[in-house]
């Protein structure tokens, strides 16, 4: 049951009383803490929630409906957002979510987000820099588009969720992070370990590039941004371990250890020319 006060709530807000909370599966940082209450989702707010909400409202106002509409921040420290109905695949990902059709639809959705975000000024807002583009930029990016952060209907991506890593950057970097997670960019061992079936990964990167609408220069930029994306996630993981974050250490131990980042880097370096040739 939920009552209380919503901070930053517009006149359309409705506080539901007597509606049971339904826990939603998924997530790493907030695992077990995300619930559905009727038409809304409640999840722990973060230091950047106000900025994220402003961004989500702006892209919705621009006509892009593929993100949840923020409702407000509860006085119990949870943010409330619109619930978007559909299927959210969790690892090990089901076959339908690993198809080229699913990948292309995720990529087109990201392109739609980027187009809608161009009118939003990130200045004056605060952002999570953990996965942010090291080169910086002026376009707010998602930075963590993986299948479990996407809502699907009938195998087609219809919405992006979980924007806690959103930050300004380059569109190519955001697309590279999507590719790292959705192609995926992993060696054979880790691809199988996390439940991805064997696939032609260079060909899948081309599927993403085609779906986004990249020209020749854009494909070169994507290849270069892949290096930044691979380096950034490794640096974030090592930083969490160095600071002794128990949740990060437990997650890392459960998902292959710090060695998986070395394996990914070696695999990407060994296959870089193959990816470049396929993208042409």
Language model: regions and residue ranges:
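ATP-binding pocket architecture of kinase catalytic cores
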Residues: 21-142, 146, 153-156
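ATP/Mg2+ or Mg2+-diphosphate-binding catalytic cores
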Residues: 233-280
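Active-site activation/catalytic loop segments of kinase-like enzymes and analogous catalytic loops
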Residues: 175-213, 229-243
């Amino acid at each position: 049951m939920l009552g209380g006060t919503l901070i930053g709530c517009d006149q359309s807000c409705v506080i539901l009383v007597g509606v049971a909370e339904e826990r939603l599966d998924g997530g790493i940082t907030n695992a077990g803490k995300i619930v559905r209450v009727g038409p809304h989702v409640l999840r722990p707010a973060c230091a950047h929630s106000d900025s994220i909400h402003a961004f989500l409202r702006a892209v919705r106002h621009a006509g892009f409906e593929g993100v949840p509409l923020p409702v407000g921040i509860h006085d119990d420290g949870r943010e409330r957002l619109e619930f978007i109905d559909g299927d959210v695949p969790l690892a090990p990902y089901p076959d339908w979510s690993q198809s080229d059709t699913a990948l292309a639809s995720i990529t087109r959705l990201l392109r739609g987000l980027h187009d809608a975000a161009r009118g939003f000024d990130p200045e004056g807002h605060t952002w999570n820099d953990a996965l942010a583009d090291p080169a910086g930029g002026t376009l707010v990016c998602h930075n963590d588009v993986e299948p479990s952060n996407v809502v699907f209907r009938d195998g087609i991506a219809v919405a992006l969720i979980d924007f806690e890593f959103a930050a300004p950057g380059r569109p190519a970097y955001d697309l590279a992070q999507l590719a790292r997670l959705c192609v995926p960019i992993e060696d054979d061992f880790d691809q199988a370990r996390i439940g991805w079936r064997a696939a032609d990964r260079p060909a899948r990167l081309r599927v993403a590039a085609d779906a986004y609408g990249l020209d020749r220069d854009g494909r070169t930029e994507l290849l270069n941004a892949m290096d930044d994306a691979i380096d950034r996630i490794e640096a974030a993981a090592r930083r969490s371990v160095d600071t002794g974050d128990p949740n990060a250490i437990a997650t890392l131990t459960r998902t292959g250890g710090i060695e998986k980042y070395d394996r990914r880097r070696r695999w990407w370096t060994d296959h870089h020319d193959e990816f470049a040739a396929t993208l042409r």
